[in-house]
Each structure stands twice: as C-alpha cells, then as structure tokens.
Swiss-Prot record:
<dbReference type="GO" id="GO:0006474">
    <property type="term" value="P:N-terminal protein amino acid acetylation"/>
</dbReference>
<dbReference type="GO" id="GO:0042803">
    <property type="term" value="F:protein homodimerization activity"/>
</dbReference>
<dbReference type="GO" id="GO:0017196">
    <property type="term" value="P:N-terminal peptidyl-methionine acetylation"/>
</dbReference>
<feature type="binding site">
    <location>
        <position position="99"/>
    </location>
    <ligand>
        <name>substrate</name>
    </ligand>
</feature>
<dbReference type="GO" id="GO:0000139">
    <property type="term" value="C:Golgi membrane"/>
</dbReference>
<dbReference type="GO" id="GO:0120518">
    <property type="term" value="F:protein N-terminal-methionine acetyltransferase activity"/>
</dbReference>
<comment type="subunit">
    <text>Monomer and homodimer; monomer in presence of substrate and homodimer in its absence.</text>
</comment>
<dbReference type="Pfam" id="PF00583">
    <property type="entry name" value="Acetyltransf_1"/>
</dbReference>
<keyword id="KW-0012">Acyltransferase</keyword>
<keyword id="KW-0333">Golgi apparatus</keyword>
<comment type="function">
    <text>N-alpha-acetyltransferase that specifically mediates the acetylation of N-terminal residues of the transmembrane proteins, with a strong preference for N-termini facing the cytosol. Displays N-terminal acetyltransferase activity towards a range of N-terminal sequences including those starting with Met-Lys, Met-Val, Met-Ala and Met-Met. Required for normal chromosomal segregation during anaphase. May also show histone acetyltransferase activity; such results are however unclear in vivo and would require additional experimental evidences.</text>
</comment>
<dbReference type="GO" id="GO:0010485">
    <property type="term" value="F:histone H4 acetyltransferase activity"/>
</dbReference>
<dbReference type="GO" id="GO:0008283">
    <property type="term" value="P:cell population proliferation"/>
</dbReference>
<dbReference type="GO" id="GO:0006334">
    <property type="term" value="P:nucleosome assembly"/>
</dbReference>
<feature type="modified residue" description="N6-acetyllysine; by autocatalysis">
    <location>
        <position position="105"/>
    </location>
</feature>
<keyword id="KW-0472">Membrane</keyword>
<feature type="active site">
    <location>
        <position position="97"/>
    </location>
</feature>
Length: 242
C-alpha cells in the first residue's frame, strides 16, 4: 500500500475480529513487519481459535493493523517470565500476553497502534474484569521503535532474555515488557520493603511509635531466633512471600 495517508485517517479506521479468510493477508503483513517466520498452524489459530483476541484495524476495507493477544491464567506463563506477578496473587489470576501488534508502514504515527492497544484493554475489562493483573510481551532488544512505543504507554522492561529469538538461524536477544493493571505488581524487592516501611512510619502518630517499634523489633527477633521463649500479648503474626 503506497497511497498518501491523510492526517484524518484514524477517523476512517474500523475495527473487526480476524477470520479465516484473512489468513493470506495476515501472512503477507507479518512477513513485512516481523523477522520471525510463523508456521501455518499459527495463522490458523489466531484467525479461528477463540482463545485469542485477534483484532484488525481496517481502512476503506483493507487491513492496516492488527493485534493478537491471549488472556490466560498466570500458571500458564512460560518459565522465563514466571515472576511477572508476585506469588501472593492466586493461581487463577490472569495475565494478557501480546503475541503480535503491527501497523502498515504508511499508517504508522496515526494512532492506530494506540487504538489497537486500548481496544485490548477494553476487551480485558469486559471479559476478565479486574482478574487480569498484567499485560506483557516480548520484543527484540534492537527494535527501538517498538520499545519506545511501549515505554511511552507505561510498559516497563522486566527481563533481559539472551538468545531468546532464532531468526534465520541466528540467535537474537529479547526483552520482556510488562504493563501492570488492576493492582498487579511484581515480587517485592528489598527496596520496596524499605519504602513500604518508611511510608508506614511516616503515617504513625508520635505516641504510638515506641510501642510499634518494640512490636516490630520483637517480631524480627523471633524470626531470627525461633527457639526464643520471649512472648508478648501484642505480638504480630505475618507471612512472607517471595
């Protein structure tokens, strides 16, 4: 497609789900957009299997962009991304994985990519509601255009994945990027615990500080000395998650 795209193109863009008849078009587009070769079964799945959210952006009847994502339980996250969510979230907590997001070159920078991403968020809020806690994806470390797109929309780098991709027989590095939603968050680091403690102390009234410090110190002592016979009526019980 080589026509000049008007600045008002977004107002003429329509959205619809991909279907089996789109396979040839989607193959051609993915060949232009991505260096990875997908098997025919992948194209059949994303255009027919209801577990995928496969949305096309069309302009005057032609597909000019698409997003493919899967909403799944956190237990189905692959090992390399297993720590996307803190272990405190239940096993039926859901995540959304973006398999593909692309826009025809002439239509880039017209808001179509953002429209597709926002449509995925709307779909999540309708189907998964607040049970979905994160949206994540993988990207080549050299794909600065995509990285800037996601970072400008509040996605944050979570993992560096050496040799994650095999492109025409050459191994390439990747990143995992994550957007947390509905209160989702990664496992806490030591810095997070320190910041949480500082916030809690800032909210204490002066008169309660000595007693609370004693209780926290007692709890800490017991965690290091489980054989200790020290006891207190006001002791704190807590569990630690990793």
């Amino acid at each position: 497609m080589t026509e000049v795209v008007p600045s008002s193109a977004l107002s003429e863009v329509s959205l619809r789900l991909l279907c089996h008849d789109d396979i040839d078009t989607v193959k051609h587009l993915c060949g232009d957009w991505f260096p990875i070769e997908y098997p025919d079964s992948w194209y059949r799945d994303i255009t027919s299997n209801k577990k995928f959210f496969s949305l096309a952006a069309t302009y005057r009847g032609a597909i000019v962009g698409m997003i493919v994502a899967e909403i799944k339980n956190r237990t189905k996250i692959h090992k390399e991304d297993g720590d996307i969510l803190a272990s405190s979230f239940s096993v039926d907590t859901q995540v959304a994985y973006i398999l593909s997001l692309g826009v025809v070159k002439e239509f880039r920078k017209h808001g179509i990519g953002s429209l597709l991403l926002e449509s995925l968020k709307d779909h999540i809020s309708t189907t998964a509601q607040d049970h979905c806690k994160a949206i994540y994806l993988h990207v080549l470390t050299t794909n600065n255009t995509a990285i800037n797109f996601y970072e400008n929309r509040d996605f944050r780098q979570h993992h560096y994945l050496p040799y994650y991709y095999s492109i025409r027989g050459v191994l390439k590095d990747g990143f995992t990027y994550v957007l947390y939603i509905n209160g989702g968050h990664p496992p806490w680091t030591i810095l997070d615990y320190i910041q949480h403690l500082g916030s809690a102390l800032a909210n204490l009234s002066p008169c309660s500080i000595p007693h609370r410090i004693y209780r926290q110190a007692h709890s800490l002592l017991c965690s290091f000395l489980p054989w200790s016979s020290i006891s207190t009526k006001g002791g704190i019980e807590y569990s630690r998650t990793m």
